[in-house]
Structures are given as C-alpha cells and as structure tokens.
C-alpha cells in the first residue's frame, strides 16, 4: 500500500527576515534620492534618456545607497538602541545578526559598484563609491560624533545623487549637475536640524553633538531660518544659468516662500510639534522642487 505523502511547504523564505533587511536600506530615503538621480539624468540630455544607463544607473545607485544605509545601521546600532526614534530598528532588536548585516551591506555595495562600473561608466561608479564612503564612514562613523557641524560638512555626500544621475548618462562632470548638488547641500541642514530639535533629548542622551544640544534650540532655529533663505537663493541657480524656465521659477519661488515661512513660524511662533512640521515640509519641498525641474525640462 502506497504511503500517503504529506507535502510540507518550504518555509525558508517565509522565515527569512527580508523586511528587516529592506528596512536597513532605508527605502523611503532611497526613493526620494532616486527621484533626484532621475532628474539629474533627464536634465543632462535634451531628449529621452537611453534605456541602459537609465535602468542600470538607477539600480546601481539604489543598491549602493541601500548599502550605505545598512552601514549606517551597523555603525549606529549601539546608540540606535538607546534612542526613542530608532530603538526598534532591526539590529538593536536582534532581528538581524551583526555579521549578516555586514555581509548584506558589503554584497549590496559590491553589486551596485559592479553594475555601475560595467553597465554605466567608471566615473559614476567611483563617484557613487565616494558618496557611500562619505556618508557611511566620514559622516556616520566620525563627523556625527565629532562636531555640531556634522550635517553641514557631511551633507555633501547626501547631496551627490543628481550629479550621479548626470554622469550616468553623459560620462561627464558638468557644472549644471553641480548646481543640483548645491541645492540639496543647502537643503540638508534645515531639514535635519528641525528633526534634531524634536529629538534633542535623544541626541543628548547618546552624546551626539547635534546643534540643538551644543548651541541650544533658539540658536538652531535661527540657523534653520537663515539656511532656508540660502536655499531659496540656491534654488534660483538653474534659472540663472538657463537650465530651467518660468514654470520652475514660479514653483520654486512658492516652495521657498513656504519653507521660509515655516522656519519663521518655528523661530517666532512655535507651537507643539512645529519642528516636525518643518521637517515634513522640507521633504515635500525637495520632492516637489525636483518634480518641477523635471516637468519644466520637458515642456
């Protein structure tokens, strides 16, 4: 008599903590970053972006950005476990072993670099690697713990994506691509300082010298306000060099006025939760600004 066979589903994949690995890549941050990469690609060319550098460039940059984020999780795992905003991350919670996280980050970086080097161009591969090291090593491992100007200095690494998109389709280091870097570079401090105000106690507890901890909240609010003005000026650069036109000028001006107004409210008429309102507005500001650059380019 034939033995009845019981089919047991293969549950290996279901046990794999893929969500934890995905979380370590900071997918929301990478998605916004990829928008700026795409805009850099599109603005670099008068017509359509060729398919190979578009797909391979986006994929390679995304993998290396995810690797940088995973390295950030690795380096910050001790302080993450002590902070209310980050204590539930995969490494502090033990969802992913440290050795597995390190292997994951290294493989992701290697695959991303290979994709860019062989399928896009070496210039983009090396620039992306420099950005990864700038964020994961220079900023996360050193600057973050060394100076209240950590965000200002380290912000350059996070501002590089549109230039990476530009070089991916042109294999050329162009000044117009650098203008997009300047915009994100000026945007980064008010974005992160608003969050730092909201999470001041957390940063103080783990001895991270964020500006509100070292110089006080009032001084930080002033810096945020001044940087929004600087950002508004930086946002005019694409128009001044003829890279963008009237639609972008109108839209970016309205966004700049909105950001400056939010920063003014934070400084002079703060209400509970205002710092996080500024933080959230800054995300929409950057997203809409780059969408405007894209739309203006094609009309």
UniProtKB/Swiss-Prot annotation:
Q: What PROSITE patterns has UniProt attached to this entry?
A: UBIA (PS00943)
Q: Which GO terms describe its molecular function?
A: protoheme IX farnesyltransferase activity
Give TM segment ranges: 29-49, 51-71, 100-120, 123-143, 150-170, 177-197, 223-243, 244-264, 275-295
* Keyword Transmembrane helix recorded: yes
* Enzyme class per UniProt: transferase
The membrane topology term of the UniProt record is: Multi-pass membrane protein
Q: Which UniProt keywords apply?
A: Cell inner membrane, Cell membrane, Heme biosynthesis, Membrane, Transferase, Transmembrane, Transmembrane helix
Q: Which domain of life is it from?
A: Bacteria
Task: Kindly report the protein's main subcellular placement as a broad class.
Answer: membrane
Annotated protein name in UniProt = Protoheme IX farnesyltransferase
In its UniProt entry, the species of origin is given as: Shewanella amazonensis (strain ATCC BAA-1098 / SB2B)
Which gene carries the instructions for this protein?
cyoE
């Amino acid at each position: 008599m034939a033995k009845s066979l019981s089919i047991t589903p293969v549950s290996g994949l279901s046990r794999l903590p893929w969500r934890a690995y995905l979380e370590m890549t900071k997918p929301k941050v990478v998605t916004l970053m990829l928008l700026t990469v795409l805009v850099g690609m599109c603005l670099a060319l008068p017509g359509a972006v060729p398919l190979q550098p578009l797909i391979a460039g986006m994929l390679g940059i995304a993998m290396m950005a995810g690797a940088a984020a995973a390295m950030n999780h690795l380096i910050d795992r001790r302080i993450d476990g002590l902070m209310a905003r980050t204590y539930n991350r995969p490494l502090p919670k033990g969802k992913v072993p440290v050795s597995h996280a390190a292997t994951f980050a290294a493989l992701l970086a290697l695959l991303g670099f290979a994709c860019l080097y062989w399928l896009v161009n070496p210039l983009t591969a090396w620039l992306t690697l420099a950005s990864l090291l700038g964020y994961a090593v220079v900023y996360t491992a050193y600057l973050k713990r060394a100076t209240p100007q950590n965000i200002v200095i380290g912000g350059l690494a996070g501002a590089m994506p549109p230039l990476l998109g530009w070089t991916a389709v042109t294999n050329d280091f162009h000044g117009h691509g650098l203008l997009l870097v300047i915009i994100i570079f000026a945007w980064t401090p008010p974005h992160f300082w608003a969050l730092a105000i909201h999470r001041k106690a957390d940063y103080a507890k783990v001895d991270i010298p964020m500006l509100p901890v070292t110089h006080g909240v009032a001084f930080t609010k002033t810096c945020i306000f001044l940087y929004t003005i600087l950002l508004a000026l930086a946002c005019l650069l694409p128009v001044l060099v003829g890279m963008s036109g009237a639609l972008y000028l109108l839209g970016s001006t309205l966004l700049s006025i909105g950001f400056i107004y939010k920063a003014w409210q934070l400084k002079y008429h703060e209400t509970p939760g205002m710092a996080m309102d500024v933080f959230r507005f800054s995300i929409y500001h950057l997203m809409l600004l780059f969408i405007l650059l894209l739309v203006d380019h094609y009309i």
